[in-house]
């Protein structure tokens, strides 16, 4: 962010506003003084603080209402925004947020080779690479891979990015400690699914993990979207007979896609974290 003076401090910051969900702000004073007002949602002042460069200025919490005003003519200050690692790439590069199942499973993944099968623009690949994993990203969409490559270069992340058709069931690169495929297999030709899953399994190192999230269609909850492939109840679990299931459920979830009323589409998903 730029350095502002008493004259150039943006008008929106002088008025009531708040930080976004998942975003923290920190104010740094280089010279002079600034008045910070804590507000309620109606604009009433809850507290007033005078900050200088000697002040220990706290972070502004997400969605906290506030406003500021110069308290001296020689004011020089700037703002820095912060977020959690799982939100970083989404906020900075306008990507979809890292999948919640990837975030949850990451602490138990062995630090090694990760294959993101159907990576798209890299919402999961970038997060895992930033966490120190050796990531390979495969996807059929060249435009998505190009954006991923640009972000990886800008962030100084070494990600192996390759075009790949999942239906070929011919994963490159030997064995992986982790293979993830989140919200991808529903777009695959259903006749290739047995080969695709067998290929994932055969390229998973002993003790390694497969994390899959995919659409379902069941008698009690037919899939509202015409995906090429939807899993029946228990189908994915059967493919992984003999593996250790650390997580398996067939719960309802939401797509980012919306219906004609603007509501996110609800449907049943199979979520599985299996260890070889």
Regions found by a protein language model. Name each.
Residues 178-192:
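A short SAM/SAH-binding and catalytic strip from SAM-dependent methyltransferases
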Residues 2-22:
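Conserved short histidine dyad/triad with adjacent acidic residue
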Residues 194-206:
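A short glycine-rich, Lys/Arg-flanked "PGG" loop and its adjoining helix->strand segment in the class I
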Residues 14, 83-109, 115, 121-171, ...:
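Class I (Rossmann-like) S-adenosyl-L-methionine-dependent methyltransferase catalytic domain
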């Amino acid at each position: 962010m730029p350095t502002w003076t008493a004259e150039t401090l943006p008008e929106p910051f002088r008025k009531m506003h708040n930080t976004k969900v998942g975003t923290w702000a920190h104010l740094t004073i280089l010279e002079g003084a600034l008045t910070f007002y804590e507000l309620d949602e109606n604009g009433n002042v809850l507290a007033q603080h005078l900050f200088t460069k000697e002040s220990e200025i706290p972070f502004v919490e997400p969605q906290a209402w506030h406003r500021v005003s110069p308290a001296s003519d020689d004011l020089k200050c700037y703002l820095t925004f912060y977020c959690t690692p799982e939100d970083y790439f989404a906020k900075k590069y306008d990507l979809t947020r890292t999948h919640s199942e990837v975030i949850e499973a990451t602490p138990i993944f062995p630090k090694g080779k990760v294959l993101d099968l159907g990576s798209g623009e890299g919402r999961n690949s970038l997060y895992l690479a930033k966490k120190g994993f050796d990531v390979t990203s495969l996807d059929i969409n060249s435009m998505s891979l190009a954006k991923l490559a640009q972000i990886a270069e800008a962030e100084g992340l070494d990600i192996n990015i390759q075009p790949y058709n999942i239906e070929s069931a011919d994963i490159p690169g030997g064995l992986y400690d982790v293979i993830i495929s989140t919200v991808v297999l529903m777009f695959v030709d259903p006749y290739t699914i047995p080969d695709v899953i067998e290929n994932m399994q055969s390229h998973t190192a002993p003790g390694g993990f497969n994390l899959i999230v995919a659409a379902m269609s069941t008698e009690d909850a037919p899939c509202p979207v015409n995906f090429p492939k939807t899993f029946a109840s228990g189908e994915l679990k059967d493919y992984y007979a003999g593996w250790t299931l650390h997580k398996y459920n067939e719960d309802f979830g939401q797509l980012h896609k919306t219906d004609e009323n603007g509501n996110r589409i609800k449907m049943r998903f199979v979520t599985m974290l299996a260890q070889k």
